[in-house]
Amino acid sequence: MTFVLQDSCIRQKWPYPTLKIKGGPRCKTLRNVERIWAFLMRHEATRHDMLLCVGGGSISDLGGFAASTFKRGIRFGIVPTTLLSMADASIGGKTGIDWQGFKNSVGTFHKPTKTIIDTRYLQTLPEREFLSGMAEVIKTGLLSSYEDFYATLRALEDGHISEELILRIRAIKSDIVRRDPREKNIRQWLNLGHTIGHALEEAGLQWGRPIPHGYAVMQGLVAELYLSVMKLNMDRQPLRLLTHLMIEHYGKVGYSCKDYDRLIAFMRQDKKNTNHTIRFVLLKGVGEPVLNCTAEEAEIREALDFLFTL
């Protein structure tokens, strides 16, 4: 039997028992996981049943984690309704919730049984959600090639992304995940922009100024491309292009040098770190990611200076 977990903002009816939870960055809580477990238990769900998650990336992260832990794991499917979830969050089997203020600090690998892509959901997507998704799309383009990177920038400028480009971005990420399903090596490439991005996102949540995941990732990409220029001598042109588009479409960053200590403290909690050292994915060039890059605190502060003074 199928059970549905759906973002309460979506007005779609299913012929299955449905639990509605408001999506967004605040929904990935242990309390909501318990609500899903109770819903499944109340309807006598078995290990042979499936939980279908309808919504953005936060709903699939939340529902996937609940499914992976209910009765030691039941199947789950995803109907992504945002660009972010279509192009990124619905791929790869990562699930998780935020705990004690830290992003995705509790989670599992649990691959969805099915994913249903329907781009008609994007026709009513608010601009803010489109921009949030485009940050992950651009990140994947940066990891791939100049051709893909420029295609993603054109989509951002046009305010529209084609189904062909969505499928291309999904294929790039899916290939990386296929080659490294447990994130032991090259799958960590997908964390480009996320060391600083997650710190900004966590800070926003804890300080009562939440920002969309993709906005934080876009800011993280700009700062980490700056580090790439500084540390790996990457050509500055991708940084110039991305900086211009971030200012034009995403606005300025609402932090200052007074926040550096706390932001760096968040970075120290990043799951990529080893030996208490903050680690980054940086670029030698477009399509040339480098794992396990380190930076001195002074260098991180310089990158934040660049970002915050734009």
What are these regions (language model features)?
Residues 151-261:
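Active-site segments that bind and position negatively charged phosphate/pyrophosphate groups
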Residues 1-50:
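ATP/NTP phosphate-donor binding region
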Residues 37-54, 63-78:
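Non-catalytic interfacial helical region
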Residues 64-157:
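A glycine/threonine-rich phosphate-anchoring loop and its flanking beta-alpha core
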Residues 49-68, 188-200:
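Glycine/serine-rich anion-binding loops at beta->alpha junctions
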Residues 135-138, 234-310:
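C-terminal charged capping/lid subdomain of soluble metabolic enzymes
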Residues 42-45, 111-114, 120-127, 135-147, ...:
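Generic secondary-structure signature for well-ordered alpha-helical cores
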